[in-house]
Amino acid sequence: MLTTLRSRCSSLLLNQSWKLAPNRIFASSPSFSSSAGISNVSEILTLPEVEKILADVKADNVTVIPTHNHCFWADFTVIATGRSDWHLRNIAQALVYRAKQKQKGAKHVMLPSVQGYNSKWIVIDYGKFVVHALDEKARGYFNLESLWSAESSGTDTSDQDLQNVFVKVRPKNNSKRKPAKVSS
């Protein structure tokens, strides 16, 4: 998954860096999303279509998180829960199938990238948005919603955790010896 993201980012920077000023390449703006270079947006699935497909395949707990202010590779992140490995693969297949059907007869077909097809976390990358399909245990473990909500909130929990790391905790004295009293 990270290799796909890394390759997409590097190819975007190489292919679209001439469109932007050099100091705006890494700026997180909606204009520099992965869909910025696509001229015919009608061929790509829209967010309501993806939500309908996820509802049709009975994906549980579908969450849409707007990420255009936080990252440049996607405008939205969609997180859905599948009940089994088969259900996760079915979610991915339904999304890819619908993208193929919508682009039938087009000169250039743009298919989404699918990563982790035989795992408990499948990522389908459409360019404008990224769909994460996880099973219940993986979704609870990775807790992707809190990553994006913590990033969007004003409080930074990483600084608070860093401050707590440097607090020295003295171990409790469990020896039978009484501590020596220092007289002054």
Swiss-Prot record:
Residues 1-39 form a transit peptide. The keyword Cytoplasm does not apply. Keywords: Mitochondrion, Transit peptide. It comes from the Eukaryota. One of its GO terms (cellular component) is mitochondrion. SUPFAM superfamilies: Nucleotidyltransferase. Its main location: mitochondrion. The keyword Repressor does not apply. Disulfide bonds: none annotated. It is found in: Mitochondrion. PANTHER family: IOJAP SUPERFAMILY ORTHOLOG, MITOCHONDRIAL ASSEMBLY OF RIBOSOMAL LARGE SUBUNIT PROTEIN 1. HAMAP family: Iojap_RsfS (MF_01477). This is Protein Iojap-related, mitochondrial. It comes from Arabidopsis thaliana (Mouse-ear cress). The lineage of its organism: Eukaryota, Viridiplantae, Streptophyta, Embryophyta, Tracheophyta.
